[in-house]
Amino acid sequence: MRIKLEKELAKVHFKAKFLWDNGATEEQMKPTLALIRKSQWRWDMVHSSHGAAFHAPIESERLLSDGLIYALEAEKNLDVLKEKLHIAAEFVMPDISTKAKAQKEIGLDIPKEEAAKKEFLKTIVPKWIEQAKKEGRLVTQK
């Protein structure tokens, strides 16, 4: 159920962007965004409560099922709005089958992010370590 919901959530997020890019207004999108949010919350609740699938499997499945229903309802709303706006272009789900493809699709510049992390580790972390040493708060240093 979790995988079904994750695929549907990804689709409705991209489909919502497609409609934004084709002229949908905030007022038109408001009910659909509420459904997407409800769906996302349910996925997040189950996914972030690490032991839920073991300790409360029926409740976890119920939450994921509810999330899927909200996501499918959101997709239906998006399809109706697309027709209402007379958008001729077809929505094409991007290929996000790998982490690299997904990162590229959302515009994440990995080399830039890696460079920023390297700079952070080189400049900021040593200052934190030095300050912790001065204040006697450094328990261990690797």
Task: Label the model's feature ranges.
Residues 1-114, 118-120, 124-127, 132:
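Primarily the internal scaffold of c-type cytochrome electron-transfer domains
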Residues 134-142:
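Extended, compositionally biased alpha-helical segments that mediate assembly or anchoring
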